[in-house]
Amino acid sequence: MTLTLRVITPDKTVWDDSVEEIVLPSTTGQVGVLTGHAPLLTALDTGVMRVRPGKDWQAIALMGGFAEVENNEVKVLVNGAEVGDSIDKETARTEFQQAEQNLARANQGDNRQELIQATQEFKKARARFQAAGGMT
């Protein structure tokens, strides 16, 4: 038996297919989902969701949202998502390094709003770079 996974953003459906296993980046840590999982509604952090449609794992960068698990169906509703294979690794690396520098600068200052924004941009850039295979 498999799970039906749908990853939906405000703009499009990023994934709509069967998978064997899912690891979600919830706000309280990673959540593994297999066939027969108990019903669950969880908030998702910006991070990487790993899915196993067959033998190999695939990564999808998620930009925060919610996931609902019920009756072997998993609905992931997020602000943004990109399948790792579609992300250019070198571009993602450059964006990650820039976000890391911006976060370091924001940590030096006393502007709370700037720090919050830099932290969010860092998390997004890290998720994209991880999904592209740039870091584990």
From Swiss-Prot:
Main location: membrane
UniProtKB keywords: ATP synthesis, CF(1), Hydrogen ion transport, Ion transport, Membrane, Thylakoid, Transport
Signal peptide as annotated in the record: none
Family: Belongs to the ATPase epsilon chain family.
rRNA processing in keyword set: no
Record-level Gene Ontology MF annotations: ATP binding; proton-transporting ATP synthase activity, rotational mechanism
Membrane topology: Peripheral membrane protein
Protein name, per record: ATP synthase epsilon chain
Subunit annotation: F-type ATPases have 2 components, CF(1) - the catalytic core - and CF(0) - the membrane proton channel. CF(1) has five subunits: alpha(3), beta(3), gamma(1), delta(1), epsilon(1). CF(0) has three main subunits: a, b and c.
InterPro entries: ATP_synth_F1_dsu/esu, ATP_synth_F1_dsu/esu_N, ATP_synth_F1_esu_C, ATPsynth_dsu/esu_N
Organism of provenance: Prochloron didemni
One family name in Pfam for this protein: ATP-synt_DE
Subcellular location: Cellular thylakoid membrane
Role summary: Produces ATP from ADP in the presence of a proton gradient across the membrane.
